[in-house]
Amino acid sequence: MNSAPPYAAANAVLKEFAMKKTLGIAVAALVAGASLFAEGLSVNGYIRSGISIDPKGETVKTGTWLPGDYFGGGSRLRLNINYDGVNGGATFRYQKDADDDKKFFISDNWFSGSNIKWAMGYAKFLDGKIIAEAGKLVDTYTSTGGWEDGTFGDNAGAGIGARVVISPVEGLFITASASDLYLEKYKAADDEVKDRDAKEGDLKFNEKLFGFTAKYANDAFFVTGGVHLAKSYYASFGLTAVDNLTLVVEAFINDTADVDDPETKLYPWVEYTGIENLTLAALGAITIVDGSTSIAITPAVSYALTDVISLAAESTITIPDKDIDPTDDTYAVITPSVTFAASKKASATVFASLSTDTDQAKHSFGAGVKYAF
């Protein structure tokens, strides 16, 4: 029976200690440095978690704070630290999500590097018309501005590298970036490794390093677009002319080496809050891969009865592609909930999740708590 080398466990412990130490130093340095300029410093975030039980009482899950694709979400701890000065600043996000639908606090990856969603510094030139950014990047200027609010890959994973943002006129932003988001690594069989021009695991330098994006916004609408030379693309359009109305359509195309076939995803989103205490919304998700199309539609409504009690309901309707599997049927998961607000920052929610097809999704009920700081 094969076993790991005797030093493997020690190396794993050292790597975990190094990650914890690095994360601790990064947070401490950012807080300490920004505290010198407290006027531009902000620290905020939230923790949310919940528990759900199936009607038979056989399983308990702690990975869901509140079911549902619109008002809901998984258990999560998020910490944002930002400093924005006259000539530059820094932004940092730590976010720990539930590993799956069953566990959150018991997971062992609290100090994983993937939990650092971004850690970026920036410098402003010419009164902010030119901005230089470096670190683990996040796009704060040209993201799609819709439900996904993403760019390449996703907005919480823009890679490590550098970016230049140019704003030649009011409302227009143009960016060029170089990051490791889509870069491939050298393998032992590559000629460059055999010739010792590169080491196994080194990042390959090629056109997949570069991405370009743009956004234009005025009082009536905004439009965004991005092209990455690794064959990743996005675009969006949003209407902003009507008060209390959100209307955005996003499109993402992924034809990178990470996928077997090109993927196109569309996200239409509309929300209206023009009636006091009432929110009406609908969210769509359309995925097209190799000629097959799957659709999910989520209508949602919430109403604040008082400052303390709010009612909400949503239903995610999944429409599969019959060409892939004729036996797949359309089904819906309905999630009614009641939220009790202890304050603007603290709330507790009780919920039920009811499925029209228990082979696709199970019934459940439970409760969750959220505290923002």
Language-model segment annotations:
Residues 33, 38, 84-86, 125-130, ...:
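Outer-membrane beta-barrel channels and translocator barrels
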Residues 66-77, 112-117, 154-160, 204-210, ...:
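Residues that define the transmembrane beta-barrel architecture of outer-membrane proteins
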Residues 1-42, 129, 189-199:
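Cleavable N-terminal export/targeting peptides
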Residues 50, 303, 338-341, 346, ...:
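Outer-membrane beta-barrel "beta-signal"
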Residues 213-323:
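Detector for outer-membrane/organellar transmembrane beta-barrel domains
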Residues 75-83, 119-123, 162-166, 212-216, ...:
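Residues on the lipid-exposed face of transmembrane beta-strands in outer-membrane beta-barrel proteins
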Residues 40-50, 68-185, 206-222:
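Outer membrane beta-barrel
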Residues 45-51, 90-96, 132-136, 176-180, ...:
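Transmembrane beta-barrel strands of outer-membrane/channel proteins
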